[in-house]
Amino acid sequence: MPKVALLKQDGSNVGDIELNDSVFGIEPNTHVLHEAVVMQRASLRQGTHAVKNRSEVRGGGRKPWRQKGTGRARQGSTRSPQWVGGGTVFGPTPRSYSYKLPKKVRRLALRSALSSKVNEESLLVLENISIDAPKTKEIVNILKGLQVDAKALIVLSEKDETVIRSANNLQNVTVLTVEELNILDLLMHDKLIITKDAAEKAGEVLA
């Protein structure tokens, strides 16, 4: 079982904690991580792109000249795709790009991401995070105590509005619960700060 230091929010060490081996101690699967990132990024696409076909463009689309006798190529409509102002053929239409990977694959990706944080020594486990009032300075002081000056992801076991509101003004800090954990946030933040309860909960949920 991977063993990491258990810290107070001021950065002082209070001992060690053993993490669930099947969640925090596996060999990261880079292929599955890639698949999960592609899936999540696809789900973020708006998919609102659209063009007008020949039935939707402005104008009546009358026949420009008679069928025979002019010596020119026959034309059926001034809104045919080859005409200026005509419709577009096979253009993009609004669609959803989102799709789902199997649940087992998604969980393996999360376990791989968490294990890679342990391997990189980028995981900090706190006894708990306690803030009396929602103030940005409180989170700043916690990060200073932990000597974290990079992008940080804070993971809680339950939603705590005081902590969330305290971090709202910090561009490089994101606060999530265990249920909200996702691949992009795990990989895009340099440091993962997780409470003891959240680490234990993740060990149960993702095992």
From Swiss-Prot:
Pfam families: Ribosomal_L4. One of its GO terms (biological process) is translation. InterPro entries: Ribosomal_uL4 (IPR002136), Ribosomal_uL4-like (IPR013005), Ribosomal_uL4_dom_sf (IPR023574). Residues 45-80 are annotated as: Disordered. GO terms for cellular component: ribonucleoprotein complex; ribosome. Part of the 50S ribosomal subunit. Belongs to the universal ribosomal protein uL4 family. This is Large ribosomal subunit protein uL4. The gene is rplD.
